[in-house]
């Protein structure tokens, strides 16, 4: 299991002093088995499954608890905002809202300190050429820590991406959120002047911005660390390079589908997005398009982050 060491001064925390200390686990306890469609990785306290068809996790069990209610996804879509009213048609024409991940080859290498799983994949949609070429590498340690390294090449004939990241559908009991980034209100690359960088705590309910017309909301920009937990267990996402996250009871599909806020129906999960980047919000409902420096127009990029499920001991 992983235990936490915190360094707190008042309400602020030195993230670099926050360390996750694994109990001694010898690598011989890590078992890796695969068949035509799945890779099963099992340690003393965890059991993970990766689908070879997507290169993504379908099961993430730690200390006997399943963290994922539904399979993990690569995510390039967001529920269009009022300011996306014009670019939305370009995104829809590119079928970004219907995109999914398809893996072609997978290599499994077991070493001294864990297992490394590398897949070559694409983000695709029906009737259009490949949107993204992706190399996904997972490194899983014997204590259950997961390091992700996702290298992406975008077809530059496609429009700017709404976002790129990983979407997880977590156990709904993981309702307490602690993060180090821009807060306490929602923040985006071009919408954070009223926010400040610091350590914040909230419940998932608190992170939802209740716009009358449902749309993308509640993201937090420039984060180094986010933790979702309850009184007994949790999961951490962290990265050396700042990222954005979103934790919500509503899927992007639900936010897009409904016309009024009172029509929204909660998911059976905490929808947890860990994002490399999102396109800027802009003001194009009544003003200019997103400024060039806030457009997510990268053609080559690499997203590295760490996931650590844990129990409180």
Predicted features along the sequence, with ranges:
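Beta-strand/loop-rich accessory regions of lumenal/periplasmic or secreted enzymes
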Residues: 18-313
